[in-house]
Amino acid sequence: MSKQGDDCYFYFYSTCNKGDNCPFRHCEAALGNETICTLWKEGRCFRNVCRFRHMEIDKKRSEIPCFWENQPGGCQKSNCAFHHTKGRYVDGLFLPPSKTTLPSPPESADDDLKAAQITLQQNKLSVQSNPSPQLRGVMKVENSENVPSPTHPPVVINAADDDEDDDDQLSEEGEETKTPVQQPAEENHNGLRIISTRKSNADTKQDDSLNFGIKTLEEIKLKKQKEKTKKQSEGPSGVPAHPLQSRTVPVPEKENVRTVVRTVTLSAKQGEEPVIRLNIAEKPGKRKGSVADVSGLPLKRSLAERLGRKIEVDKAPRREKGAKPAGEIHVKTLEEIRLERANQRGETLTAPQAEVCCKVEDPSSGVRPPPAVRIKTFSEALAERKQRRLEEEKQKLEEFLTEKRAEGERKKQRILPPSVPGKVKLEEPTRKIKPLEEVHIKTLEEIKQEKALRMQQSGENVPAPAAQPGPAPAGRKLLRITKLAAPGKEEKKTVELSRASPKAVSAPAEPSNQSAPNSKAQVKSLEGTVKEKLQLRQPEKLKKEVAAVPSATEETVKAKCKVCVKPSDSKASTPTKRALKRKAAEISPSAVAAVKPLSSTETEEPPAKKAALTAAPALPEDSLLTKPGVEKPPSSLELQLGSQADSVEQSGDSSSASASSQSVAKAQQLSSTGAGKAPLSVEDDFEKLIWEISGGKLEAEIDLDPGKDEDDLLLELSEMIDS
């Protein structure tokens, strides 16, 4: 807050909220004073307390009534500079009303302005209520002096009327081109035009002019433009009649000319109506007259050409049909049209696609009108194509399925060789247990390879000495060798891939007969095993190979020794225990899948295999290659194989019994060292029970070490088989 300088506007006329921080002057002595300090104007006022104002005052606030005086609280400022007509109390002090009087001349001027505005509004209302052309001209002349602004609506309308009148005069005097259709209409309206020019002030004729003149200027101008374009396009056809009629009207009277022009435009409108009616009525039928031909036919031809229809052939029958009354065309109901469409759809479904083009031209000779044909070609043709495609796809799918079924039956017939009857009998229940996808996995090439290998091996009577050379294995592979238990019955074991990489080594299977050792090996190709791995997941295959064991074996397994099946990709905690238990499980023949610890599913066997397990040779003690002292990482695997498979197969029941006792003793040692939980008597009972159920059949499992090359593995296999 400063005591010098310019005044604070809010301090003197309102309230300043800044207080001492305000840079402008706050002076109590100058409150309510409206006199400007002359020294401040010159810049020489250095008084601390100056009673005069230090700001430019351009308003006489003493003549302006105070706003707060009329409010409920009243004006509460003791030094209010505005005019007060009433006395007021401020802080207990009575302040009389202002001595100055408000000036009266401005009020009278305002009254004059208000009166002028009222008269103008009345004039506007009168002009709007009487929109006849004569009265418009008169009101325009009378009100042109009083209208303050040129944007007044009646002025705009009258100015447009003047321009219109000038255009009408020029068109009547200069241009002599009128259509012959309009001339009789003008002659018909001749009497109305003459009466309207002579008796324009009569009320009845004013009503007529009101009815005819209600149309806006834009509509009339549009009609005139259309008439001019028609005249220019058609040429001067009706020259001599119209100028005579226009000369009969006195030109200098503007009002008369205006009414004549309005009636002429109305007659032109009435003259145009029959042409439009003719066009609408004769659109579906014959074209009569040159005007209708000019307006209607080129559009129809262009549409027909767009649709690709033949114009010359189809036009004549269409016109003959159009000669019928219009009611016959519209007689058809929705149901009839739908029935026709349904019939045509049925025809198109049976007929090939080449008939679609013919359908566009055929309805010209039939009963149906052409618009329905157009609808048919666009929307329904697409629907028909979609239906055809769907039907073709369905037929292709059905043919494909029938071909696949026929191929499956052929494969089954090819798989049935006369030399191996028992194998096929046991293949069917295993396939019933497995899902249907396994039937479609094997290709023809794989089946042919298997058949060729079987024929070759049965001719040579030699078990598969070496597997097909493949890439080096990156993970664990399980190759199962199954032996015949009883004559005429045999188990089929598929090669199980228990690693993630899609490479496989074929599994030699050694079926044999006790009476005559017909040893055959079933070798699956690399592609077959890879596809089986990709399409059948490992856990599902394990669960389906490990089907239900008889109830007696389940109870004994649960009660005495928990032998668990584990997917071969998972890792065990202790490698030594896993290896030992794998060897122990190798001797117990009831397990079909790889037997490993730390898993939930227990060993089971399908009942179809139980019938086949009657008597089988056992592996001797030295056939197991065991390394009990060496610890391996969980990924390392041991190679385990029954080396003397052929000699054991060819031996009799006596040798099998002696070998079985040795293997039971070996299994007893392995299970006691590996598990270390069950006592020896329990394990003896368990081994005896399994031996009784299996009938002496053994299954050897080969675990291939991924660290070795294929050549080394094949050499070891051949040595074991030869020994």
Curated annotation (Swiss-Prot):
Residue ranges with Acidic residues bias: 160-175
A GO CC term attached to the entry: nuclear speck
GO MF annotations in UniProt: zinc ion binding
Keywords from the UniProt entry: Coiled coil, Metal-binding, mRNA transport, Nucleus, Repeat, Transport, Zinc, Zinc-finger
Compositionally biased spans, kind Polar residues: 511-522, 637-649
Biased composition (Low complexity): 609-620, 650-672
One example of a Gene Ontology biological process annotation: poly(A)+ mRNA export from nucleus
Pfam families, A to Z: zf-CCCH_3
The UniProt record lists the keyword Repeat: yes
Main location: nucleus
Region annotation Disordered: where it falls in the sequence: 142-208, 223-256, 404-428, 450-526, 565-681
InterPro entries attached to this UniProt entry: Znf-CCCH_3, Znf_CCCH
Coiled coil: 376-411
Cited PROSITE patterns: ZF_C3H1
Start and end residues, zinc fingers (C3H1-type): 2-29, 31-57, 60-87
SMART domains attached to this UniProt entry: ZnF_C3H1
The protein's role, per its UniProt record: Through its association with TREX complex components, may participate in the export and post-transcriptional coordination of selected mRNA transcripts. Binds RNA.
Designated name of the protein: Zinc finger CCCH domain-containing protein 11A
Name of the gene: ZC3H11A
